[in-house]
Structures are given as C-alpha cells and as structure tokens.
C-alpha cells in the first residue's frame, strides 16, 4: 500500500493491523515506530527525531546538526545540495513482506528545478528491527543540457547534536574517544579539515590516540569496511550504552571496487555512496542518468551495558548481502530501480593462483574496463569476495549482465583479467582457469610487496608507539613526521641490506614542508631517490633486455582528485623518470591528470593505482655496483584552492628488475 501525502493535511494515524509497527502523520511530520525505535521525519525529508528505547539519539535539531539520516550531494551546477530543499513531496508505503514481517517506509521525492534533477530517498522500518533500510536515487532527464557535471559526492548522514556519543570507530585500529568540546574549541588548523589539539593535551583523544584530528584518519577501503559508527559508553546516559552504525550489507551500487576508500565517521556517521576522495572515479550526470543506490542499513542498538565490540559485532553480523533478501524482494515494487533476486545469479569458480600469492580476491566489475574505473558506466554493478588458498570463490546475488573478472593477490605483480563473464538470473556461471603471472625474464630484485599499498614503508602501517591506542602512522597526518630528520641526505637504498620499513619512505615527495613544527621547505633531498644494487657476470651473461616494473599505490599530479586537465599547471601530467647508472636518457613513466589522487595528504597509502613496465638494453647495466635513480621534477608544486601541500608526489607499491 502506498500513500502519497501532502503534509498540509490534517493529522492522520494509520497502523498496520493491531501491531506495534505504526505510522502517524501530521501537517508537518511523519512518524515510523515499532516497539523499540521511533523515527520522526520532517516535511523536508530529514529524520529530525530518533529514539531507541526512549533514548534521544540525535539531540536538538540546529541547522544541519541533530538530524539524519538524510541525503545530500555535491552534484548541482552550484555544488552542494540537500535533497528536499526545493519541492519535497513525501510518500508513505507499508505492508507485510514475504517472511510475514510488517514494514513501513517513507519516500522523499524532490526535483531541483534549475536543472530538473530528481532525488528520491527511501527509509524503511521493519517490525522487530532497530534500524532504517536506506536507498537513494538520482535521475536526470534533460535533452537541452545533455551533460550536466560529474556526480562528485552523493551521501547520507546521521548527524547528531548531543553529548550522548563518546567514541567513534571504523575498525579495531581506528577507534578513539571523540574530542571534547574544549579540544574542538581550542584546536589549531594545520591543513584543510585537519586540526591539532596541542592546546588541550589532557583531552582523551589527544592522550589515547593522536595529537591531530582529521576525518580522513577514519577512512577505510571498502574491501575492509563493513560497519562503522558511534558508540556511547554510558558516561552521559546513566550507564546505558548505545551504538549507531552504518552497515554496508550490500556494496554493489558503489563504484571503484574493493580499493575504493572513503570517509566513514568523524562525529557524523556517513554513507559515502559516491565521492572522488583518494582519487576515485565518479560518474558523469548526463541525459538519461538514473541510478538507485543501496540498500544499506543504519542500525541503532544497545540499551543495556554492552561494550563497543559487542555492539559492533551485532552490526557486523548484518553486513551480508544475503541478509533480508526476501524483505528487499518484497519492497522492490516501491523502490525505483532496485533489482530483485529473480534477476540475480551467481558466479562460482577456481583460478589456479601463482606461487606466492596471498590474500587473493575475485572481483566482478563492468566488462572491458579496469575495475577502479567502473564509474565510466553509471549503471554498472560490482562484487568481490575473498578467495581461499586454492583460488576457489563464489559470488552470489549478482545482477544479470556481462562482467569483467579481475583477480589480484599480495605478492604478485599485475592482475588476472577475464572479460565477457555472463551472469543470468537464478543461474550459476562457472569459471575454471589458471593465472599466468606476468614475466619479462628472470627477476633480479624487487623492492616492496606488490599489494596495491605503500604501507610497508616508513610511516606507513607501522603502529604509532607514542599513544596507547597505537594507530597506524599513515592515518595520522603527514606533517606529524619530519623528512629532514628521517632522511637528512635523501633516500639511498641498497637492495639486500637496507630495510624497507625504515630506509624507504611511504611517499616520494618533490617538496616537503612546512609542517607545524618545522617551517623549512625542503626540495634538495626529496626529488631524487637512489636504489643501489649489484649484479654478477653470470646474471648479465647473454642478457639483452632489462625490464623495470614500477607499481604506484597512488600519485598526485597538479590535478589532485579532480581528473580535470589544467593547462596552466606544468605538472597536470607528471613524469616520474628512472635513470639507469650514468645514462642521460631516462625511462619515463607518465602519470596522467586522470590518474591523480590526493593520497598520503588525506591519510591513505592505497589510492588510484598506476603502473608501468619499461624496457631498456641490458648493456646499460654493469657487473658490480649499479644505481637506479627515481626522479621527480625538483620543487614541483601546483596552486591549491584549500590549505593543502602544493607538492606533487608518488607512493610506491613495489618495483622490480627483470632480465631476459
């Protein structure tokens, strides 16, 4: 049953039978309630009050705080827009699903009249559950302006305004007390969206986690992120604990595959559906764009004395695309664009893995495209699953269509790729194949582990020893470290004797600094890195060709995260040059403007991947000592619109030299 309502009507009360799931409507609000959870919606399409067992989870509404979950975007010609701000129309739907469980839903319909962009936000509450099932839709039909812009951000937010919440968490390693009001009031800006709490050294966040705070510290890759949220430890709620979680029970309508990383929680619990953070690709909004994202689930739990880990475990138990499939099939008639299980199939397979492969993963994305680029087709779906040690995998609930299968694994250079994987509804597609790893001869040496991350190097995943919660160092803030102390003479690495964890940095800067503790700007020791290695006569005997492979876990050109070519910037495309011994001509790896990502400056060691295999005559090498010089342009910077370092940089995943 669907009720299209104008909230100027007189008060109306409806109930689904004689149960505890009720819907009430007034001239200004809609209320969904079951035995434990009550959500009150404004006529502009926001949750403005939310109660679990009578506990106010949001606090008072004040501007954009004390509300949510709600939908906003950076997607209009003017930039940011909150759905419901122009022509909101609210609908109520209700019924009983295939399991016999009653549900009720609220649907916001809004058209942004300057462009005709159509927004829909869906919230569903089921009897017996303490959370809201969410779908979000954007449609654009405009032949007059067939290209509008990119969909730069599309997100839902739970944005409380209360001292109930005491901790934020996106993983076991990324759990910390929320900074106090005093710390926030006395914080010092050190970078865009990054602050220092040196004026409140007794604050719990400062003493336990870090001196610096940025929302990017709690960002995660979608491969690893299933739930994130806020925790109330009971100190402000008479000993009763609560949790507010975004549960990513499905990930097939996001973009970027398992390497996509994004913001999760910073006092706000986000569902970042689309963004270009960390250089991720975003779809273009063109005539005919029509995409429904979801479902995801905002879970609110607690009401007793459960610990953070116990409440998180409850949330994690729901982070499974098999959860509530019958319910989602039942409400598909209400949700424009949602694909029911009758039009979904499975892919089952085994890929013989190369020797040394660990943590293998199987990925389905749009056919014919690199998996991080699947946003080029806004209609595309994506799926992945961890493979077992024998290369076996199964992917279920896959929307029918044609896909590319990609497999990658730690320890192996390159990927396995297979196009044309056809999936049909209620059918199983079977694949058996062997992954032949790329090879250009005999491997002489490698530096780093090919795992699509620069985290194994200095100030990467190593744990901070100075705070009791020991967060990984890369998550904090690049300016917390000092290049001139770490590498006073630059990087001079020797294969076989140097330690990658201490002698090779997680980022290769063109320029370093200034930082809060060091006003100097250094560009003499940063741009050239030396890698020394020895070769024997036997290794070079009868060898004609050498191949240098460089895999980057991220690279920042003058284009930053935008994928926009900037003709006035000399480094909008960036050349990383490799010099072999005394050769005057370099091997050049050109990093394109559309491959750029703001990675380490946004607390990340894995962003948009870039790689190159470059050949050169083996006689450039010599018996005995050899040197590879990795060269970035000296003092290469761009103009930044925000308070961010202007330097270009690259982050190495792994390098290797082969001879044939």
Curated annotation (Swiss-Prot):
Source taxon at top rank: Eukaryota
Glycosylation sites per record: 22, 27, 109, 142, 238, 284, 432, 492, 532, 594, 635
GO MF annotations for this entry?
carbohydrate binding; rhamnogalacturonan endolyase activity
Main location group: secreted
Nucleotide-binding in keyword set: no
For this protein, the Enzyme Commission number is: 4.2.2.23
Q: Which subcellular locations apply to this protein?
A: Secreted
According to the record, the signal peptide region is 1-20
Q: Which UniProt keywords apply?
A: Carbohydrate metabolism, Cell wall biogenesis/degradation, Glycoprotein, Lyase, Polysaccharide degradation, Secreted, Signal
- What processes does the entry annotate via GO biological process terms? cell wall organization; polysaccharide catabolic process
Query: Cellular component per GO?
Result: extracellular region
Catalysis: reaction(s): Endotype eliminative cleavage of L-alpha-rhamnopyranosyl-(1->4)-alpha-D-galactopyranosyluronic acid bonds of rhamnogalacturonan I domains in ramified hairy regions of pectin leaving L-rhamnopyranose at the reducing end and 4-deoxy-4,5-unsaturated D-galactopyranosyluronic acid at the non-reducing end
Its biological purpose is as follows: Pectinolytic enzymes consist of four classes of enzymes: pectin lyase, polygalacturonase, pectin methylesterase and rhamnogalacturonase. Degrades the rhamnogalacturonan I (RG-I) backbone of pectin.
Similarity field: Belongs to the polysaccharide lyase 4 family.
Q: What protein does this entry describe?
A: Probable rhamnogalacturonate lyase B
